[in-house]
């Protein structure tokens, strides 16, 4: 039917495994550079991402890569996914819940179960934008 590639997606339980085994998983975020203060534990520092990726391109393109973004509607994760697959990585997945889901779970359960690089109090800053609240053009 065509040569389509399904994007592998993971849930928060898979992400908990990834953060506990950094020797197996590289965790990459797609948040803007201005929003790097609160990240999921063991996320690669944005300033080191390029050199680490270049190292693995040469040494091990089968490394497990986990990408996450700001929230479930963050399209930057798909762009990063395509970029990594295009340059040769074969085990790439997206944690679709992103920082928003992670911070909500941290707030409900425990920061030991959902660790971050710092405590974030403004969880709603990570929520996805509303689709229905955007004014639509109407014929007059």
Placement of each model-derived feature along the sequence:
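Rhodanese-like catalytic fold shared by cysteine-dependent sulfurtransferases
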Residues: 2-17, 21-25, 30-66, 71-140
């Amino acid at each position: 039917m065509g040569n389509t590639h399904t994007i592998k997606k993971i849930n928060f339980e898979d992400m908990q495994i990834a953060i506990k085994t950094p020797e197996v998983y590289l965790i990459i975020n797609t948040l803007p550079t201005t929003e790097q203060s609160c990240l999921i534990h063991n996320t690669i520092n944005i300033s080191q991402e390029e050199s680490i990726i270049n190292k693995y391109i040469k040494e091990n393109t089968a490394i497990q890569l986990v990408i996450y973004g700001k929230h479930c509607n963050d399209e930057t994760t798909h762009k990063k996914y395509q970029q990594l697959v295009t340059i040769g990585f074969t085990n790439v997945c997206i944690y679709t819940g992103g920082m928003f889901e992670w911070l909500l779970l941290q707030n409900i359960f425990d920061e030991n179960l959902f660790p971050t690089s710092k405590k974030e109090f403004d969880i709603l800053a990570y929520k996805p934008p509303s689709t229905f609240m955007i004014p639509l053009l109407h014929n007059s």
